[in-house]
């Protein structure tokens, strides 16, 4: 009773009342200025997350969270400096220094989301998501709008080797109901993916981001980066395709380069499937348009992970290019080349399949 009495007194303050009401119905502030990135540059998408959360925190998003002892790598350092650590001496801090404790991080964020008034996020390497998995599954069951920012989303982790390189993870998290798995293909699409995650009210999201720099696409030549809201869209079209390439995230540029190499003799359509869950929610007319191609077309998937599951789109006779073993230690580019995740290797596999 005393607490409620004190609250009612404080609600007489106009600014406090405004903040209180906003915390009870969290939404993206109207004055947010989203970062934008210049076409033709190369940027690691993990850097986008840092820019996004710093902007949101500075505009009163009631954002709380942090990294499992990987602040520099997850690019949450700037957020931590801006909002300060929560501690026994600073209860107003909004950065949670979780330490190397992925499951407690997930469980703590679930509790915050259940209580309401704050929008929680957690960050670590994608390969360590499995430590957090029981909490992720529970939040999907409970329809909690929590976000997990997972960086180092593929074998491009590099020298840390197979213990740090996610292989089976993408498909295993796509298997959890009521969970958005967003894997943007460039920096501007990463901004849009982050927006989508923060707009969710009754389900959690994973935002999967690269360690390595990848090209920023010219959206005057390609569809708008907010097309990821459809989950899947035609990245590069053609008439009467002989070949259709499906890809996500950092493999989109590989697909587009491969198309260029094939274009002299083949018509190639490239489809970006950055979020399978959102794509499945689209109307049948839209999905049928994206997935429109002759029955004779060769269907190809490219993704830096296991290929099981891609048959949903490529069929029994398709060509699924990925990694069905654990990774290797070495520079990211060298590891990708070893596993054939580059345009020349993909081109060669497609030509072999067509023979």
Write out the residue ranges for each language-model feature.
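Thiamine diphosphate
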Residues: 2-355
